[in-house]
């Protein structure tokens, strides 16, 4: 439980740092005819942390949502300008900062996890990484939803990188409804599945 809290705090801090970056560098409201002019404003956002992915069938036939700590953030498309009037955000600027925001999130999360004792490796594009001590086989097992989407794309003869719109459509059309389960049940199920795949939490220590 103590380690779990540290992980959750690390992820929350990475989310905050990312929002702070966008608020500082990419937050502008439209002004004037056609919204052609814009001025600096501050974002208003609501964050909703989730601990799992959508349910999917795993290689051993089990069906459950994988451990997948993430945060959904909703940014209000309104902001108060300097003269107290309200305007819509210049969303193009926000989209232009997408890659920088992703890199900030990943680098902050990596630093925070390292600070509490985790190692990181397999650093990929835009700063993505894996936790040292967790091999590719266990990552693949606990990525059933991702594999499900990947297989659907393969059947269509493409990939998410080549066909992002199709990937988004498949993601929406194949997702199962989340089942409301207590965290204790979730954690117990994940531990059982991990042990069945010869993984022990002690491997990370």
Per-range role (PLM):
Residues 1-205:
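Beta->alpha loop/short-helix hinge microenvironment recognizer with preference
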């Amino acid at each position: 439980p103590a380690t779990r809290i540290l992980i959750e705090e690390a992820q929350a801090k990475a989310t905050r740092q990312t929002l702070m970056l966008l608020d500082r560098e990419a937050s502008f409201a439209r002004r004037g005819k056609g919204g052609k002019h814009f001025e600096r404003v501050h974002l208003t956002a609501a964050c909703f942390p989730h601990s799992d992915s959508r349910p999917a069938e795993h290689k051993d036939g089990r069906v459950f949502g994988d451990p997948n700590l993430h945060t959904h953030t909703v940014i209000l498309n309104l902001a108060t300008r300097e003269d107290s009037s309200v305007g819509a955000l210049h969303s193009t600027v926000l989209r232009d900062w997408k890659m920088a925001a992703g890199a900030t999130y990943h680098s902050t999360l990596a630093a925070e996890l390292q600070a509490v004792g985790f190692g990181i490796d397999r650093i990929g594009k835009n700063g993505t990484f894996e936790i040292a001590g967790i091999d590719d086989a266990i990552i693949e097992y606990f990525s059933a939803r991702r594999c499900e989407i990947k297989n659907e794309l393969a059947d269509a003869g493409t990939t998410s990188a080549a066909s992002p719109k199709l990937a988004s459509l498949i993601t929406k059309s194949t997702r199962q409804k989340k089942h409301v389960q207590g965290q204790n049940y979730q954690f117990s199920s994940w531990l059982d599945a991990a042990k069945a795949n010869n993984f022990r939490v002690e491997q990370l220590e």
